[in-house]
């Protein structure tokens, strides 16, 4: 048991020693890396100062202090030049110091402000362009009817010059209107004529013809078969065959008269069935 316990203690001690050695080795390696990184940064900073003074043709100095506040290194290596530049900078006014001083936070803030100003300018320009576009669109809408009128006038002028014998559009429209109205008027006149002829035929079918005898002053009624033919032919034959002793009364066509009273007074005792030798035709309406 004692031997086993001693072996365990030895192993624990060896493990602790190994871990401590590892920690020391790690710390030494980290410090070595830090020193190398710092030395590389110093070289880079001094190199950038040299490039800046050469390219911009300005006075640049670098003063490098340690953690304890001791001066470690300067650039340029001549400390008199560095002291002269530091004194000149300290004698400047606060405004001049701000102009010649560059801070990262101030630089970023200035960049952000410049970006916002640029965006504001872009927005203002966009608004002005949109307003100008609206004005142009309104003017275009106002000029569109005038453009259509001018194009219509030009087309009319071109058509008149190409075909001088063609009538103007106004005459063509009047002719078309007349072509539409003439059939309507002719149709109306034809219907009126048909109505007049039909009414005349109806009236003729309701008219009786009477012959007047001057000798015995009596009337004689012509049969219906005789009254149905053309009365103008009958009157023409009577006018050519009769002498001047027989007077032809005027033809009377009363429209649809509902009376049987004769138009000319006659003797009520005259012989109606006896045909006279000479007679004048008289017409009376009947139902």
UniProtKB/Swiss-Prot annotation:
Q: Where is this region: Disordered?
A: 151-171
What is one process in the GO biological process aspect for this record? positive regulation of transcription by RNA polymerase II
Q: Where in the cell is it found?
A: Nucleus
Top-level taxon of the source organism = Eukaryota
Chief place of localization: nucleus
Which Gene3D superfamilies has this protein been placed in?
Transcription factor, MADS-box
* InterPro entries xrefs: SRF-like_MADS-box, TF_MADSbox, TF_MADSbox_sf
Transmembrane region(s): none
The record's Pfam families line, in alphabetical order, gives: SRF-TF
Key words of the record: DNA-binding, Nucleus, Transcription, Transcription regulation
PROSITE patterns associated with the record: MADS_BOX_2
Q: Where is the MADS-box domain?
A: 30-78
Q: Name one GO molecular function term.
A: DNA-binding transcription factor activity
**GO terms for cellular component:** nucleus; plasma membrane
Subunit (UniProt): Interacts with MEE14/CBP1.
Q: What does this protein do?
A: Probable transcription factor that may function in the maintenance of the proper function of the central cell in pollen tube attraction.
Q: What name goes with this protein?
A: Agamous-like MADS-box protein AGL53
> Which species does this protein come from?
Arabidopsis thaliana
């Amino acid at each position: 048991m004692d031997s086993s316990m001693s072996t365990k203690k030895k192993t624990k001690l060896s493990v602790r020693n190994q871990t401590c050695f590892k920690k020391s080795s790690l710390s030494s390696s980290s410090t070595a890396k830090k020193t190398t990184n710092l030395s590389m940064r110093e070289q880079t900073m001094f190199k950038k100062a040299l490039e800046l003074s050469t390219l911009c043709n300005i006075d640049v100095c670098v003063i490098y202090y340690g953690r304890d506040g001791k001066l470690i290194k300067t650039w340029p290596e001549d400390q008199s030049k560095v002291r002269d530049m530091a004194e000149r900078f300290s004698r400047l006014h606060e405004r001049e110091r701000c102009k010649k001083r560059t801070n990262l936070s101030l630089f970023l803030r200035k960049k952000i402000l410049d970006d916002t100003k640029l965006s504001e300018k872009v927005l203002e320009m966009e608004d002005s362009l949109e307003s100008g576009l609206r004005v142009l669109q309104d003017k275009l809408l106002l000029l569109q009817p005038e453009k259509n009128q001018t194009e219509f006038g030009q087309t009319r002028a071109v058509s008149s010059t190409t075909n001088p014998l063609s009538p103007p559009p106004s005459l063509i429209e009047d002719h078309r209107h007349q072509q539409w109205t003439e059939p309507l008027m002719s149709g109306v006149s034809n219907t009126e004529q048909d109505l007049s002829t039909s009414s005349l035929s109806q009236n003729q079918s309701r008219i009786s013809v009477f012959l007047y005898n001057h000798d015995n002053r009596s009337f004689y009624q012509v049969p219906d078969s005789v009254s149905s033919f053309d009365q103008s032919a009958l009157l023409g034959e009577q006018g050519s065959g009769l002498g001047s002793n027989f007077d032809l009364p005027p033809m009377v066509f009363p429209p649809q008269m509902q009376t049987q009273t004769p138009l000319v007074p006659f003797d009520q005792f005259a012989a109606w069935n006896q045909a006279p030798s000479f007679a004048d035709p008289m017409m009376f309406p009947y139902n």
